[in-house]
Amino acid sequence: VLFRSKMAGGILLGFLAVAGIVTGSQGSVTVYAAEELQGSGTAEDPYVITGSEDLWKFAEIVKASSDRNECAKVADGVTEIDTTVRGEKKDLTWNPIGDSSGSYKGVFDGNGAEITIHADRSINNNAGLFGILGSGGEIRNVTTAGSSKGWDSVGGICGQACSDAKIVNCNNKADITAQGGQAGGLAGYASSAQIESDTSISNTGAVTGTANVGGLVGQASGGMKVIVHEG
């Protein structure tokens, strides 16, 4: 069993048949169709993520969904995804999947890939690859790298994990900064959630905050569990 840690002191738009631009008084927004991703987004037939573009599209699909329970899996053979690059665009700031308007309730399988993010929410909460994991939400088999910054509830995998959400076989290399509190390598805050691994759980990113700072979880409550299966 291995634990490693490095610490330092609206408008709802529906899906279109094809991608397009919707314009209005507030400007324009690109709308991506679910059909652009391989798979149907169910647990049995998850969306297939082949790179950064697909991951950005998946995030947009989830945000436009009323249920936010879409599932996705990184394709076999994909070992690294850098979300700071999307097509010709570079140095992008990642928008966490799932937030206070609706937590993520699907299953995301990183399939062993390392995903680099630059999540900078500054004065806002819930920064990470995912913002808030809710009931039924599960993130598995992924390592986060890069940086995650916010006010409260900041982690590499997610800002918050609540209501029986699960983080399975995940690790973090990203530097975590909470300008307020609740900073953790995997999750800033966890309540009634479960962190589980078949081998080890690790954080090698620097974790900083003014209060409630932890290598894996900044603040835990409600019977949070950490389970490591041996043998």
Regions inferred by a protein language model and the residue ranges of each:
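Short, small-residue-biased leader/transition segments that mark boundaries at the very start
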Residues: V1-L2
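Surface-exposed repetitive/solenoidal architectures
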Residues: S28-G231
